[in-house]
Amino acid sequence: MPEQFLHGIEIVRIDDGVRPIETVKSSVIGLVGTAPEANDERFPLDTPVLVTSRRTKIAGLGTTGTLPMATDGIFDQCGAMMVIVRVTEGINREETISNVIGGIDNATGQRKGLQALLDARSVAKVHPRILIAPDFSHEMAVATEMVSIANNLKAVVVADGPNTTDEAAISYRVADRKSVV
């Protein structure tokens, strides 16, 4: 008969030996944007690409568009793991916004734009939990689509608010608890 009977959970802590370093799965950023000079092999259009460090493929983004600036900013602050979806820069702003919002290609069935983040788990083997689209998320159509994707992925949207007045920033609400402006 044991001398001591334990009620509940017993925790055994092992303080020696080698333990793997793991990335917190809630910190994976899903980033959608443009990079016209990007290497098409490293960053194919409308395809989730996993980036784990500054040296891993980032040089292939080029210097123009929204993705190079966004990735530099992220790596300057923390260096988080990212799933990047590069979209085509349109002839005008409206076309580019349409490309960011994306959808499904009727001919191939491939998801495009923000919709491509839904394929991140099968393609990049990670699940983005923080969704951003720098320079586009202040557009209500983009922010609304981001919230829709976030609900599906159980993620959070970090959206840019309007940069006009305090009243406009307060009234800019996507009406969902999964968004941060």
Predicted regions and their residues:
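Surface-exposed assembly/interface segments
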Residues: 1-181
